[in-house]
Amino acid sequence: MEKNGTVMDYLRWRGDLPFTRDGFNEVDDLVLCIISYINFRRFDDLKTTDPTRAVALPEVAARLTKEDEQLGLSELDYIPLMRLAAETERFREVRMFGFTHEYDEVKEMQFDAVSYLLPDDTLLVSFMGTDTSLVGWKEDFNMSYHSAVPAQIRAAAYTEEIAAACPDRGLRIGGHSKGGNLAAWAAIHIPAPLQDRLLAAYNNDGPGFSHDMVDSAAYRRVADKLHTYIPESSIVGILLEHAEDYAVIDSSNRSIMQHEPMS
């Protein structure tokens, strides 16, 4: 994309190219990670973990209303992005399943995820970032000094569960903000046979890990599959440590607002 192009621009410019002509890339991951912020809680059919019952992305987009606006911290509405994606040749055959919203005040856990079956016969597991709840913020704070928080542990278990339901598909994992950290955590902690199926894990401006984690054998085992993207003025994405390669990208926003994935 040109300098300061957004994901909406990407859909308009490249949406006519199916994955068979131009393979899945990091911007496709970001598009689907942004969609994972939308409030799908009233869509019971998306909660199935059976991939044969997955719902086409355009069908879900057609049912969205104002009450389904995204659950994250952004003031933007992500529904127009999903509707635009649903109209493109590139995304219209994507299917969705495995939506879950898990909130536990006692465990101090906020966990949201949804999975996508892609037309290239791969699977993308996508984790949402922090919502507006106090528990979500407390869990973010806990990440700075606990070796693991409940959402991280749940992310690895969720990935294993969803991947087991799709044994013939290559695996991708992604997320934005805390969701990006969860994606990397899951990649590091899933069983070795599943790591062999892992094509990539995308951390979009999410925190890193403790020094002990990035210096561990578990981390090194998948380090070449971890892809981290941060904006020029990243704040969240430079928290804690990253030992994997990362790319600095342009943003149409300034300062902390560069954390907004639509920019």
Language-model-detected regions and their locations in the chain:
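Gly/Ala-rich beta-loop-alpha elbow adjacent to hydrolase catalytic centers
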Residues: 174-179, 183
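Alpha/beta hydrolase fold serine-hydrolase catalytic domain that processes acyl esters and thioesters
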Residues: 1-26, 34-44, 51-113, 118-123, ...
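Short glycine-enriched nucleophile-adjacent loop
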Residues: 183-192
